[in-house]
UniProtKB/Swiss-Prot annotation:
Record GO cellular component, one term: plasma membrane
Topological region Periplasmic: 46-116
Predominant subcellular localization, coarse grouping: membrane
Family: Belongs to the FtsL family.
Alphabetic keyword roster: Cell cycle, Cell division, Cell inner membrane, Cell membrane, Membrane, Transmembrane, Transmembrane helix
Sequence ranges on the Cytoplasmic membrane side: 1-24
Taxonomy of the source species: Bacteria, Pseudomonadati, Pseudomonadota, Gammaproteobacteria, Thiotrichales
Name of the gene this protein is made from: ftsL
GO BP field: FtsZ-dependent cytokinesis
Native source species: Francisella tularensis subsp. tularensis (strain SCHU S4 / Schu 4)
Membrane topology label: Single-pass type II membrane protein
Transmembrane segments: 25-45
Function: Essential cell division protein. May link together the upstream cell division proteins, which are predominantly cytoplasmic, with the downstream cell division proteins, which are predominantly periplasmic.
InterPro entries associated with the record: Cell_div_FtsL
Name of the molecule in the record: Cell division protein FtsL
Assembly and interaction partners: Part of a complex composed of FtsB, FtsL and FtsQ.
């Protein structure tokens, strides 16, 4: 018995339709769909991981740079507080040590102001 092209197409379509609604084929398609979702999720997660890793590296570099700046600032302040630096500043501003006559106590000054 010879089948026509139309009959072959109809039987093939019915065969696909019947097999598609079977449990095994439905489960296979569901698993394929889950597999594709998982693969795309993995791609997204790895991309986000690389972005976060790059951000972490940038933050570590910035932390190192800020630590170096902090060390420089601490060194500058400590060098400004040395006795020689203070003495040079005092000479530049023409400062002198106070004499006994120029030293006054705050309590005495308040009393003088109150008496006036």
């Amino acid at each position: 018995m010879m089948l026509t092209n139309r009959q072959i197409r109809v039987r093939l379509f019915e065969s696909l339709k019947n097999s598609f609604f079977k449990k095994t084929v439905g489960i296979s398609f569901a698993l394929l769909f889950i597999l594709l979702i998982t693969a795309f999720s993995l791609i997204v997660v790895r991309f986000e991981y690389k972005l976060q890793l790059n951000e972490q590296k940038n933050l570590i570099l910035e932390d190192t740079r800020l630590d170096e700046q902090w060390s420089q600032i601490v060194l500058e302040y400590s060098s400004l507080a040395t006795p020689t630096a203070v003495e040079k500043f005092a000479q530049k501003e023409k400062m002198t040590l106070p004499t006994r006559k120029t030293i006054g106590f705050l309590n005495e000054q308040k009393e003088e102001l109150n008496n006036e």
